[in-house]
Amino acid sequence: MHNMSDIIEQYIKRLFEESNEDVVEIQRANIAQRFDCVPSQLNYVIKTRFTNEHGYEIESKRGGGGYIRITKIENKDATGYINHLLQLIGPSISQQQAYYIIDGLLDKMLINEREAKMIHAVIDRETLSMDMVSRDIIRANILKRLLPVINYY
């Protein structure tokens, strides 16, 4: 059985499929009521599964009649998406942010499950056993070298 976050994520992705659009607009209260969950559960899904690293932009308006607008970032080809990711990676990157990037590559079928697991192993904090600042810098450098390879090979 999937957890509530997985169910909400699949529902939002289905909205994209059914609409054939690059934008989906949802209301927190309606989704929370539909899935009998608190609005913060929806916020968690949006913040962790519909990030820039996953290829989405979020616009949110709170209050009565508020909405969450989720837009698929338009990158019609792998090169555009890879370039977008390269711009997101600064001089350092946390393990979680790096995992979001890998998940996005997997979602867009630019890598397979095996490759994703190998990349996870290489950039994991256990592998990069050093102080956090150095670890995050090295992780960013690894990804910056790896992404063009994924794009061109």
Swiss-Prot record:
GO terms for molecular function: DNA binding. One of its GO terms (biological process) is regulation of DNA-templated transcription. Keywords: DNA-binding, Repressor, Stress response, Transcription, Transcription regulation. This is Transcriptional regulator CtsR. The keyword Transcription regulation applies. Belongs to the CtsR family. It comes from Staphylococcus aureus (strain bovine RF122 / ET3-1). Negative regulator of clpC, clpB and clpP transcription by binding directly and specifically to their promoter region. Pfam families: CtsR, CtsR_C. It comes from the Bacteria.
